A protein has these predicted regions:
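Histidine/cysteine-enriched polar flanking segments
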Residues: 31-442
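Residue-level marker of intrinsically disordered, low-complexity segments enriched
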Residues: 4-5, 13-14, 133, 388
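N-terminal export signals
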Residues: 14-33
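N-terminal secretory signal peptides
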Residues: 1-10, 24-25
Length: 442
């Protein structure tokens, strides 16, 4: 399907977004364009709201994960897929059909910038008439420019050369999707990804201060909060200092020889609303914290977050209930730094990805820690989909404890587990690889 198509069109439940020109957008009804007024009572939707559909991405390196996600979600919610082009759609169809799923029941959307971790590119809301809309945040490719400047200061290539690879076209994907689906768009001056937006749907936003600051380097906290309070439905912000230590910003050092690959602190790794006043918080096994340096840092950080949340209230002044959810046992593997490394792969690293001041050399061995957390769960109507870490060394009794917590806070929902480890090695997970479209009124 040609990238230069003047208007989006449907074919076998397929919609093409790439190439939606300004002239074409002008032909859309006024309520479908960016800046359209939202009905009174608009709000960013909460993850625990009823779900109209779950969107998935496609990437050849994650085919098995996509198949597992689609198979688990299929009985509970309609599936839609955001893929780069017709070729990717064909491959995705084959993956679904290989699991016995009817790909003709899936709505495919094409966009040349479609990411695999679709959660981060688009944020949905519901207006007062319960019609979905899109919140258009600025896109920084997970703070890539700042990471480049920090990492390559004093090195070649220069920071500016690295930063030119931002792929900022992804930042307009949410607007293109909103326009093509006939949805209004609310534009924000803030930069963030969907995995860093945690709301209760009733006025409260939980923000990781370190994360939001890394994406909005030219804004102080007061300025950011003013913009947050302009977001649809947001009346109060709770600031938490930091996220999980092993969710580093891109590839980076955690402590000593321990390194990670992550987002720099997405809230969907460590703090999630179960309902409007119940907050799930990642927690560390204290025995593990006593013996493992990464677990020790995580315990310190989560204790600080717990203290803040326990003393906080929702937007209406009601106290929050904070429930500690055990983290899986720390998952790690040794990696030898090599100048010949193909860094497209999660298990290949080079000394060049670290700041010069750290003094790392090719041939050094580092210990990569996976970005693992049960809180990177997916809610899909009557289903709770959790990561499965027993095969990665987490004691079965700990995972059963996690299951019991989820069954208690999500009564009436089935709790199922899925292997997410390959996504965890690159800073993602099941929640990152899914995008929740809230149920509105048809």
């Amino acid at each position: 399907m040609p990238k230069s198509a003047a208007m989006p069109f449907f074919h076998r439940h397929t919609l093409v977004l790439a190439g939606l020109t300004g002239a074409a957008a002008a032909l859309l009804p006024s309520w479908a364009r960016s800046g359209a007024a939202l009905a009174r009572g608009a709000r960013i939707s909460a993850d625990f709201d009823p779900v109209a559909a779950i969107w998935l991405g496609y990437d050849a390196g994650h085919e098995a994960f996509t198949a597992d996600l689609a198979t688990a979600l299929w009985p509970h919610v309609p599936i839609r897929m955001l893929v780069r082009d017709a070729e990717a759609e064909g491959l995705a169809r084959a993956v679904l059909q290989g699991r016995g799923l009817d790909a003709d029941k899936v709505r495919f959307v094409h966009d040349a910038r479609a990411p695999f971790f679709v959660r981060d590119a688009v944020v949905f809301g519901l207006d007062g008439a319960r019609q979905p809309f899109v919140v258009d945040f600025r896109w920084t490719y997970y703070g890539w420019t700042n990471w480049c400047r920090r990492t390559f200061r004093g090195k070649q290539p220069r920071p500016e050369s690295c930063a030119r690879a931002d792929g900022l076209d992804t930042g307009s994907l949410d607007r293109r999707l909103g326009d093509a689906l006939g949805l209004a768009t609310f534009q924000s001056a803030l930069a963030i990804e969907g995995g860093g937006v945690e709301v209760n749907g009733q006025g409260l936003l939980i923000a990781n201060a370190e994360l939001w600051s890394s994406r909005n380097r030219n804004m102080g906290r007061a300025a950011m909060e003013r913009e947050m309070l302009r977001l649809p439905g947001i009346r109060k912000v709770i600031w938490l200092p930091r996220g999980l230590a092993h969710d580093t910003l891109h590839r980076g050092t955690i402590t000593g020889a321990y390194v990670g690959w992550g987002t720099g602190g997405h809230t969907d790794e460590f703090v999630r609303f179960a309902d409007a006043r119940t907050v799930l918080l990642a927690w560390v096994d204290e025995a593990e914290a006593a013996s493992h340096p990464v677990a020790r840092i995580n315990l310190q950080r989560m204790q600080a977050n717990f203290d803040i949340l326990s003393a906080s209230s929702d937007a209406d002044g009601q106290p929050l209930r904070v429930i500690k959810v055990p983290l899986p046992r720390t998952i790690e593997r040794p990696v030898v730094l090599s100048a010949d490394a193909d860094t497209a792969y999660s298990n290949q690293w080079t000394a060049a990805v670290f700041p010069a001041r750290e003094g790392r050399r090719e041939g050094d061995t580092v210990i990569q820690v996976a970005t693992s957390s049960y809180l990177n769960h997916v809610l899909a109507n009557d289903l709770v989909l959790l990561p499965d870490y027993v095969g990665q060394g987490t004691p079965p009794e700990r995972q059963q404890q996690v299951k019991a917590i989820y069954e208690a806070v999500f009564p009436g929902r089935k709790v199922r587990f899925i292997d997410t480890i390959n996504a965890n090695w690159v800073g993602g997970g099941a929640h990152c690889a899914t995008l929740t479209e809230p149920a509105g009124i048809p």
